[in-house]
């Protein structure tokens, strides 16, 4: 071979080798998973001294908890939203109230850590152990950085099971940083299924992505639990409730009971309009009548005395947001029921604004305790379920009262366009929306 071509060939071979090496390197690098570990301080975010990151279920929270020694405190709003809505903040008395089926418990707030309730910078926090008294949850506390993961859903949970040891990554793809390693047999909570990667959450607070080939098929899982939930018992009638309201506007009007019911058939409950709020201290007016109750019982009718909030000058929000006022209403209602022999109480608080929702529910919980102590049926009147009345929280009502009543006759009214009073499509909203069907009364 001509000597003058040898250097050229050598250079060409070298270029080819470099190109091949580059291609091989590119291919290898493309398909070799990254071993880079995610910076957990970056993942959970910055925290001030004394703060702890929160992962609630499959959601990494922006809000922080507090930690003091081995005590962890959770923000009340997080507890109410995700874990247990029955912790009620009584701001006037600086205490948390918790209504069980049989008693109203309280825990005073402190400006220092150590007790069940800690108020810091005007924000209310609950000790984790206090939350666990009444709430079914699993808590996983980890350091570096300080974080707590809480699992609270244990029925019909979508899960996948790890088939072989692998990693959960920050994003979908083998080049994404590793959050944590998981072993074969680990059950992960499935957030979203994708083509090649699934978004999953570990019980101890990592939310990321796993190679779909490394997990089994999605399934519904029920986790075994030993926590004993508080159980409400209900005072219900053996037969279907057929109730009428009886508008009674004065003490003298009670005398017209016989005339009002003379031709009435098929009814087993009558609810006279006997009580209403008179001021924001919780005082009520009463025109209840023992003679009326006696006549009703002779006709085979139960009497559920009705209390309303129709007095324009009395703020329902101001009244129900006061623990003293709520207790005042309740004590007067119970006393009146005992005095005249009523069988139950019907609450007809209407046009409730969103800001009174929490206080209204607390009122029902507290009233339920006293009603059941005195063998009184508790029922509550509600508008047909719609988005703008969601704060009535009929599901929670159904857990604590005996009967949830839906006023289905308000589809059209004075001032609205003409139409049916209670059409079938309108009434169907009731049955689709309400979980308390055996104790649901609709009109």
Tell what function each PLM region has.
Residues 2-194, 223-236:
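Primary recognition of N-terminal secretory signal peptides and signal-anchoring hydrophobic helices
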Residues 78-80, 93, 102, 130, ...:
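A mature extracytoplasmic/lumenal domain signature
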Residues 169-170, 199, 250-256, 278-281:
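Short, solvent-exposed loop/turn elements at domain surfaces
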Residues 185, 198-202, 210:
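SH3/SH3-like beta-barrel fold
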Residues 212-258:
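Boundary/entry segment of secreted carbohydrate-active catalytic domains
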Residues 431-443:
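Single conserved hydrophobic/aromatic residue that forms the stacking wall/gate
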């Amino acid at each position: 071979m001509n000597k003058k071509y040898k250097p050229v060939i050598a250079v060409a071979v070298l270029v080819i080798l470099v190109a091949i090496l580059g291609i091989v390197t590119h291919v290898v690098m493309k398909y070799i998973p990254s071993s880079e570990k995610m910076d957990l301080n970056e993942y959970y975010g910055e925290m001030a001294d004394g703060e702890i990151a929160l992962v609630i279920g499959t959601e990494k929270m922006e809000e922080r908890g507090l930690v003091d020694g081995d005590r962890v405190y959770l923000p009340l709003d997080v507890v109410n939203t995700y874990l247990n809505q029955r912790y009620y903040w009584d701001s006037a008395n600086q205490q948390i109230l918790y209504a069980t089926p049989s008693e109203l418990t309280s825990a005073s707030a402190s400006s220092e850590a150590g007790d069940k309730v800690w108020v810091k910078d005007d924000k209310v926090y609950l000790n984790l152990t206090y939350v666990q008294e009444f709430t079914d949850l699993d808590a996983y506390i980890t350091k570096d950085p300080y974080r707590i993961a809480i699992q609270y859903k244990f029925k019909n949970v979508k899960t996948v099971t790890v088939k072989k040891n692998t990693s959960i990554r920050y994003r979908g793809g083998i080049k994404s940083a590793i959050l944590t390693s998981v072993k074969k047999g680990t059950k992960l909570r499935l957030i979203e299924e994708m083509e090649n990667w699934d978004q999953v959450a570990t019980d101890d607070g990592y939310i990321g992505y796993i190679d779909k080939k490394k997990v089994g098929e999605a399934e519904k899982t029920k986790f075994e639990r030993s926590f004993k939930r508080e159980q409400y018992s209900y005072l219900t009638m053996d037969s279907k409730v057929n109730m009428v309201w009886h508008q009674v506007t004065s003490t003298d009007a009670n005398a017209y009971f016989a005339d009002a019911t003379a031709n009435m058939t098929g009814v087993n409950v009558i609810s006279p309009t006997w009580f209403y709020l008179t001021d924001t201290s919780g005082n009520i007016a009463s025109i209840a009548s023992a003679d009326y109750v006696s006549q009703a019982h002779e006709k085979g009718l139960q009497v559920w005395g009705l209390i309303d909030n129709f007095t324009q000058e009395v703020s329902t929000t101001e009244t129900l947001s006061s623990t003293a006022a709520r207790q005042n209403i309740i004590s007067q209602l119970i006393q009146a029921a005992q005095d005249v022999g009523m069988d139950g109480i019907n609450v007809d608080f209407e046009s409730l604004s969103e800001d009174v929702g929490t206080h209204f529910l607390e009122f029902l919980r507290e009233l339920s305790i006293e009603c059941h102590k005195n063998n009184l049926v508790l029922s509550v009147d509600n508008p047909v379920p719609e988005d703008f009345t969601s704060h009535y929280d009929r599901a929670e009502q159904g857990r604590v009262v005996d009967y949830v009543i839906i006023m289905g006759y308000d589809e059209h009214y004075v001032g609205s366009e003409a139409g049916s009073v209670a059409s079938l499509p309108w009434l169907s909203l009731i049955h689709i929306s309400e979980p308390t069907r055996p104790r649901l009364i609709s009109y």
